[in-house]
């Protein structure tokens, strides 16, 4: 009996691995074999065509906008100059129209379809492999069972990396990669223009203002997120953010000694009337509103994460895997524009450390978080995911050295990592680790260290950390501003991404689920699930809001519920 008990333990382990892999694959595959009836397939095709037509219509609208006769002088201000510009625009328009005609005629490109079929075949072959190997496990025991289970896990890794590599190339075919680059750039520039307009009113004395004091009693990452929260409320209520940062615990000279001012025209909090936050409607006749920390905010406005602007939601859903993180990252991007001295410091540190790609960022928090907000994680737990991602990177690029940027507040960890993993090149500045200790944390030197750590972590090709750490989440947010979509470029050993003080994080059940154990909860398609966390084993934990039951459910059976809010669109920023 013991042999069979051991066998079934391994069988369950492999099935969990299979379920996790299906979660990754399921979000990308074009076909859904669980819904084979003809009407569902036809509906999917119609919806896909409608989405393509919608995007083409939007592109044509932008094209028509660009074809308007330019106002004011062009070139030398002559009629010839105007004609030349219009001719160039007309040629460009004809090229784009021809591209649309080809798309309508030919559908998806050859490379796209070849890769789609390869992924489909890869998923089938993986299932065939699992069925065969699990049957073999039933007849094994002892060391032979252990050896065979290890081999299965090794082979599963190869299968998973092959499918993920094909999915990456699929995302780049038929100009999709170029489109994603351009669309992400356009969206970023649009939002940054809106923020810049809001933050630089023509007459500061008449501007509606929201005052935010940076000195919340916590560390740098937490304080930065506090300012981001203030900024999002300011943006939503159409108020210029006034950041009070004198006698900042990290730099007594204030925010502006490290980063560029949040406004070039309006830093004075004075106004005809001042009051504490009492809600957007109640404060409409108050010129200057003081905002508390998010923990004390009442009433709560709709502009808190994880909501995204309604006018950008459709575009964000197409271009980014986590629109809520992208939206937060736009405010972080604006806030942390460095002063020249800091820019120079970053450049010098890059050269001194020899920071280059490919590189994976690892952040290990060991001091104040351990035992309270987070569990202790040995370096081995991080390095498992580092090695996995390097093997994946090697499928599509040359990995000359396996580099790891190690950021930690434990000065002894660098030596331990180098000893245990001599085949890796660890990039780290131990002086930053010393300055991150509890006794040195709130100094200008410590601030410099944490800024550098966050910078290099965000620049990495992949991030392994604990999302319970604000530093890790800030690095992940900045990473989103450096790529069209870096939402999947991380592995957290504990929490899923969250923003302190956020509104409820909900998911929607896509497939039904019948509990197999008392720990699991039932689901029907359409049920709203309030997610508490992902266990990173194929299961998440949450509450079925319809039933009021809390427990585990398969992660692949849900999708994110995107919350949208009617943010102001600031059309004046485009003039």
UniProtKB/Swiss-Prot annotation:
SS bond list: 204-266, 212-230, 218-222, 465-472
InterPro entries: Fut8, Fut8_N_cat, Fut8_SH3, GT23_dom, SH3-like_dom_sf, SH3_domain
Domain GT23 residues, every copy: 206-493
Sequence ranges on the Lumenal membrane side: 31-575
Top-level taxon of the source organism: Eukaryota
Signal peptide: none
Keywords assigned by UniProt, alphabetized: Disulfide bond, Glycosyltransferase, Golgi apparatus, Membrane, Phosphoprotein, SH3 domain, SH3-binding, Signal-anchor, Transferase, Transmembrane, Transmembrane helix
Residue positions where Phosphoserine is found in the record: 278
SUPFAM superfamilies: SH3-domain (SSF50044)
Catalyzed reactions: N(4)-{beta-D-GlcNAc-(1->2)-alpha-D-Man-(1->3)-[beta-D-GlcNAc-(1->2)-alpha-D-Man-(1->6)]-beta-D-Man-(1->4)-beta-D-GlcNAc-(1->4)-beta-D-GlcNAc}-L-asparaginyl-[protein] + GDP-beta-L-fucose = an N(4)-{beta-D-GlcNAc-(1->2)-alpha-D-Man-(1->3)-[beta-D-GlcNAc-(1->2)-alpha-D-Man-(1->6)]-beta-D-Man-(1->4)-beta-D-GlcNAc-(1->4)-[alpha-L-Fuc-(1->6)]-beta-D-GlcNAc}-L-asparaginyl-[protein] + GDP + H(+)
Domain SH3: 502-563
Coiled coil spans: none
Protein's membrane topology: Single-pass type II membrane protein
Localization of this protein: Golgi apparatus, Golgi stack membrane
CDD domains for the chain: Fut8_like, SH3_Fut8
A GO CC term attached to the entry: Golgi cisterna membrane
Gene Ontology molecular functions: alpha-(1->6)-fucosyltransferase activity; glycoprotein 6-alpha-L-fucosyltransferase activity; glycosyltransferase activity; SH3 domain binding
Pathway the protein acts in: Protein modification; protein glycosylation
GO biological process: cell migration; fibroblast migration; GDP-L-fucose metabolic process; integrin-mediated signaling pathway; N-glycan fucosylation; N-glycan processing; protein N-linked glycosylation via asparagine; receptor metabolic process
PTM section of the record: Tyrosine phosphorylated by PKDCC/VLK.
Motif SH3-binding: positions: 299-305
Pfam families assigned to the protein according to its UniProt record, in alphabetical order: FUT8_N_cat, SH3_9
Entry keyword Transmembrane: yes
Function: Catalyzes the addition of fucose in alpha 1-6 linkage to the first GlcNAc residue, next to the peptide chains in N-glycans.
Protein name as catalogued: Alpha-(1,6)-fucosyltransferase
Taxonomic source organism: Mus musculus (Mouse)
Gene name of the encoded protein: Fut8
């Amino acid at each position: 009996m013991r042999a069979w008990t051991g066998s079934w333990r391994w069988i369950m382990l492999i099935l969990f691995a299979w379920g996790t892999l299906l979660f990754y694959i399921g979000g990308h595959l074009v076909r859904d074999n669980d819904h084979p009836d003809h009407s569902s397939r036809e509906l999917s095709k119609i919806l896909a065509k409608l989405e393509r037509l919608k995007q083409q219509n939007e592109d044509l609208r932008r094209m028509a906008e660009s074809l308007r006769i330019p106002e004011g002088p062009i070139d030398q201000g002559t009629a010839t100059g105007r004609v030349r510009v219009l001719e160039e625009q007309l040629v460009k328009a004809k090229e784009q129209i021809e591209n649309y005609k080809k798309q309508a005629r030919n559908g998806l490109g050859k490379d796209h379809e070849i890769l789609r079929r390869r992924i489909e075949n890869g998923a089938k072959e993986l299932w065939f492999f699992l069925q065969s190997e699990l049957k073999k496990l039933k007849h094994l025991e002892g060391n032979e069972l252990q050896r065979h289970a290890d081999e299965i896990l090794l082979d599963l890794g190869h299968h998973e990396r092959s499918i993920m590599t094909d999915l990456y190339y699929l995302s780049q075919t038929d100009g999709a990669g170029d489109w994603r680059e351009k669309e992400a750039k356009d969206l970023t520039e649009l939002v940054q223009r809106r923020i810049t307009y809001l933050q630089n009113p023509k007459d500061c004395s008449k501007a509606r203002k929201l005052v935010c004091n940076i000195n919340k009693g916590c560390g740098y990452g937490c304080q930065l997120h506090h300012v981001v929260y203030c900024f999002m409320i300011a943006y939503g209520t159409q108020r210029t953010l006034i950041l009070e940062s004198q006698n900042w615990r990290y730099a007594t000279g204030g925010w502006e000694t490290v980063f560029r001012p949040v406004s070039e025209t309006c830093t004075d909090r004075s106004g005809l009337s001042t009051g504490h936050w009492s809600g957007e409607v109640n404060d409409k006749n108050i010129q200057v509103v003081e905002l508390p920390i998010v923990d004390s905010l009442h009433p709560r406005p709709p502009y808190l994460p994880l909501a995204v602007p309604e006018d950008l939601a459709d575009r964000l859903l197409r271009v980014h895997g986590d629109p809520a993180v992208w939206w937060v990252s736009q405010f972080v991007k604006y806030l942390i524009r460095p002063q020249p001295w800091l820019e120079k410091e970053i450049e010098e540190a890059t050269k001194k450390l020899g920071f280059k790609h490919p590189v994976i960022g690892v952040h290990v928090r060991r001091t104040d978080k351990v035992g309270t907000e987070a569990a202790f994680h040995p370096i081995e737990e991080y390095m498992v995911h580092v090695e996995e991602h390097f093997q994946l990177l090697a499928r599509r690029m040359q990995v000359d050295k396996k580099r790891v940027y190690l950021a930690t507040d434990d000065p002894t960890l660098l030596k331990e990592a180098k000893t245990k993993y001599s085949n890796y090149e660890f990039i780290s500045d131990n002086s930053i680790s010393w300055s991150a200790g509890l006794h040195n944390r709130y100094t200008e030197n410590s601030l410099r260290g944490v800024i550098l750590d966050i910078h290099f972590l965000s620049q990495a090709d992949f991030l392994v950390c604990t999302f319970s750490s604000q530093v890790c989440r800030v690095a992940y947010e900045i990473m989103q501003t450096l790529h069209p979509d870096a939402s999947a470029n991380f592995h957290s050993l504990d929490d899923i991404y969250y923003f302190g003080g956020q509104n409820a994080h909900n998911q929607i059940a896509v497939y039904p689920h019948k509990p197999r154990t008392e720990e699991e909860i039932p689901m029907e398609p359409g049920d709203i699930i309030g997610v508490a966390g992902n266990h990173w084993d194929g299961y998440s934990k949450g509450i079925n809001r319809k039933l009021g039951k809390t427990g585990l459910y398969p992660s692949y059976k849900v999708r994110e519920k995107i919350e949208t809010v009617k943010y102001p669109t600031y059309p004046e920023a485009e003039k």
